[in-house]
Amino acid sequence: DLQMYKGRQYIHDDKKIFGVFADSCPDRWGQRLMKRREELRAKNAGEKPRKLLDSDYLLGVYDEARMGGLRFKTELEGEFLSNDREFATPPWTSLRELEQASIAFENDEKGLNEKWLKQLLAPGSSLGGARPKASVLATDGSLWIAKFPSKHDDFNSGAWEMVVHELAVMCGLNVPEAKAEKFSRLGTTFLVKRFDRIESRRIHFSSAMTMLGKKDGANAADGSSYLEI
């Protein structure tokens, strides 16, 4: 939906953002964290929370953990946006603490506990999907995604993700390295190496949703299916 020429372009009426940028945006979990941050800011300032736009989600993601190869700045010679080292991606050794923060965040009905929010915001807001998750740095400096168990799980989702990953390997599919760890009785944390990084180099990617011109939430009801891929 974004054409290869310089100048202004306009999105179709049924979409809010070009697909190439949507791939760099947080999904439901990341948006939830960023909404909670705005609610907390507004509460402390005695204001009403402002409605966050897609551009707020796109540009508010912590730069180091942003998905894909795109980075953003407002001035050609300026700094990249959201690049504050105060929010650096946490190390592998903090996984247990991050899982506990995600559990506490889910159990906090109003979601205004600043302690849990600060721990999760930078490593978790950049990622897609609805599950609680965070980016972590392995000892070799590689970026991984940790997908934590959720209080809404009806089964051990992380363990089954590992099973599906192993099946993919057995089928000869090219999939990133993955691990399964258990830090609590709630379930298994599924860990997978980021496919959009080779050491410190960022890898551009385009999702099937973008390539097919779809938008988030599309499903079989409107004719969307894996057969199109």
Predicted segments — roles?
Residues 1-229:
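Phosphate/dinucleotide-binding and metal-coordinating scaffold of catalytic cores
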